[in-house]
Amino acid sequence: MARNFLTIALPKGKLLTDSLEALTKIGIECQEVSEESRKLVFPLEKAQAQIIICRPTDIPTFVEYGAADIGFVGKDTLLEENKDVVELLDLGFGYCRFVVAMPEEKVPPRLPDGRFDLSGLNHQRVATKFPRVAEDFFREQGMQVLPIKLHGNIELAPRVGLAEMIVDIVSTGTTLRQNKLVEIAPILEATTRLIANRVAYRMKHERINELTEKLRQLLGKAP
């Protein structure tokens, strides 16, 4: 393929629409790209590019190993997968928060500053899709926990005795409330990021930088 040809990895699911909208607004015509299609690879001849549709958790791997030159991925996934890629730009959409939550009847006491006292949670079990993020957070608090990795229904774990607490991503907090869970500590905020393969970023720097700058201008972000 030509040196300036780009393979762009986009995530299935709720981030796909926003990702396609951003690319369209900077002049990359991708009207044919649809998650409803059985296709996973969409050639974009005019743009000298192709889009591949991947599971969100796989995008850092596709980019790290060069199967994609660039990708759109949530910061939550980027932190958990911990792949060797270049993070180029915060795209701003797909906002969510990482939090620690517990059943409302088991929340720890509050400290004088209003925060919950986490010290009694040392060596407790944490149900999560993000064991790396959970361990890193509690390590920063000088604590160790036992992460239990689940792929769904995280909120169920404390109710059935699988774990004492959960680490999960939330947007509105509705699911926590419905399951009688209380947020006891914020961990971090996450949005969608533009990432690049390290070799592609050197070999196709002009093309990738041009796309990055167009997205930056679209978002109104300073360099």
Curated annotation (Swiss-Prot):
Domains: entry comment: Lacks the C-terminal regulatory region which is replaced by HisZ.
Main subcellular location of this protein, as a coarse class: cytoplasm
Compartmental location: Cytoplasm
Protein name: ATP phosphoribosyltransferase
Originating species: Desulfitobacterium hafniense (strain Y51)
Keyword ATP-binding: yes
Keyword terms of this UniProt record: Amino-acid biosynthesis, ATP-binding, Cytoplasm, Glycosyltransferase, Histidine biosynthesis, Nucleotide-binding, Transferase
One Pfam family this sequence matches: HisG
